[in-house]
Amino acid sequence: MTKKPIVVGVTGGSGSGKTSVTKAICDHFSGHSILMIAQDVYYHDQADISFEERLKVNYDHPLAFDTDLLISHIAALRRYETIEKPIYDYEKYTRKQEVEIQEPREVIILEGILILEDKRLRDLMDIKVYVDTDDDIRFIRRLLRDMKERGRTMDSVIDQYLSVVKPMHNEFIEPTKKFADIIIPEGGENHVAIDLMTTKIESILQKHV
């Protein structure tokens, strides 16, 4: 191949609208070969510890992720090399033994809460996007999602938010906003900001030859 792939990082707190922004990018570039990689499939393999111990892990902390593996995979995709992407079992809190063979694409979107935390990973991105949404809105979205899709009780969601999600957001996620090239208020509802972002991606695509 002669073209160099473009890597777009999309981050923000839980419930900020990252997925909506990512979907908007994918829809806009549907005529291109595009790949979305979620950071949370790169949680560490925890097959060596018990299920009870896995439940105690703080999954909103940078150390929960196998960032070295993610960096090596993004670097390989930029070289148009095939990777063996992990498959994460969200019910067992560890990786499955199987992997997904992933071919490189023209546009690579990396989505996750902590993708801007490590400079090595930031340096592999052409565009860094932070989806900035009010804390109350993010909490309500997370509450409704976890109760509806994951069978959680209201009390358990609130407890996790106050004890883990909110402090980790304030300590690790919010500070990465300063590394973003583009900040999108109100997530996927901000169509003007998304249009500006996709225009920038198109401009870079034309230069990546």
Curated annotation (Swiss-Prot):
Q: Which GO terms describe its molecular function?
A: ATP binding; cytidine kinase activity; uridine kinase activity
Query: Top enzyme class of this protein?
Result: transferase
Q: Where in the cell is it found?
A: Cytoplasm
- State if Manganese is listed as a keyword: no
Return the SUPFAM superfamilies for the record.
Answer: P-loop containing nucleoside triphosphate hydrolases
- In the UniProt record, which is one GO cellular component term? cytoplasm
Per UniProt, ATP binds at 12-19
Which keywords are on file for this protein?
ATP-binding, Cytoplasm, Kinase, Nucleotide-binding, Transferase
Q: Which Pfam families match?
A: PRK
Entry keyword Ubl conjugation: no
| Stored InterPro entries | P-loop_NTPase, PRK/URK, Uridine_kinase, Uridine_kinase-like
Among Gene3D superfamilies, the record links this protein to:
P-loop containing nucleotide triphosphate hydrolases
Q: What is this protein called?
A: Uridine kinase
Where does this protein come from, organism-wise?
Listeria innocua serovar 6a (strain ATCC BAA-680 / CLIP 11262)
